[in-house]
Amino acid sequence: GYNISCNGENDGSIDLSIVGGTGNYTTTWTGANGYFNVAEDIYTLSASDYDYTITDANQCVNSGSVTITEPTLIIATLSATNVSCNGGDNGTAILTLSGGTGTLIENWGGNTPMMLSSGTYTYVLTDSNLCIDSGSVTITEPSEITIITDSVIDVSVYNGNDGEIYTSSNG
């Protein structure tokens, strides 16, 4: 049999090779959720156990079971750090990956998940079976620091030093 390529798919198959007995075999397959088939080879299977019964022309019977498995789900756990100052580029996005089949390849669409400025970044994960998972992260930044002039007191005489400016800031 051929197991499932990606978690949740139904592309498994079982190919029987029947030898021995007396020709004109009949095959019966049963499985989970009422699965039933009378073909020798079965396709588009989901992960499950499939029981077969083969009967030859002399009514001799052979039975057994085949298990079709699937890879674990691709899981990405995201840890992000936002930009520390407005206009900066020190945001980060780090993925901890598990599941799938073989090595998981991370693609951030040309971006490096370090030294990020504010914005939304999308990633795509691909395993050895070409199974795909994707997601995105939004990196934020604090608002810009602004100085607000609350009031101005002019100097009283030319070249004087008794003027005052009162300010407040935001951000």
Residue ranges and their predicted role:
Residues 1-171:
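Proline- and Ser/Thr-rich low-complexity, intrinsically disordered segments
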